[in-house]
Amino acid sequence: MKTRVVLPLVLLLLAAGANAQDARHGTLKNVTGVVTVGTGDTLRTAVPGGGVTQADRILTGPGASAALALKDGTLLMVGPDAMLELTTVQFDSTTQEGNLVVNLLKGSVRMVTGWLAKMHPEQVRVTTPTSVVGVRGTDFIVEVP
């Protein structure tokens, strides 16, 4: 009887873990200093190898920084004392289609664009409190005081 209950439960937990892994839109590659990631009131300490998903905010403290890689190969380097939101992160590796909107609320971010910006530059944008940047280049920096 225990086997009948435990085995399906274990399989369910494994499937949930696989789905959580698939939900990742990117991975933290480097973290220096105090960096947190999350949505709303649910913040966690950022660690190299940790995942990021759509709607996550990356918050860096004074002197801190974070580098993350998205599924399409886009690299984001978030500078010190910054707040960056991954507003829309969609990329289908099969069709090579998607949409990327990054909202820089404070601080600086360097972006090295990936596959999505190369194939569909109109689908990639960086917004700030006062502007919207359409991405046409491959490597640039945006700063918000």
Task: Pin down the residues of each PLM region.
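Absolute protein N-terminus
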Residues: M1, A20-Q21
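N-terminal signal peptide c-region/cleavage motif recognized by signal peptidases
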Residues: A15-G17
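Classic N-terminal secretory signal peptides
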Residues: P8-L13
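Flexible, surface-exposed loop/linker segments and immediately adjacent secondary-structure boundaries
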Residues: Q21-P145
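Bacterial N-terminal signal peptides that target proteins for export
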Residues: M1-L7
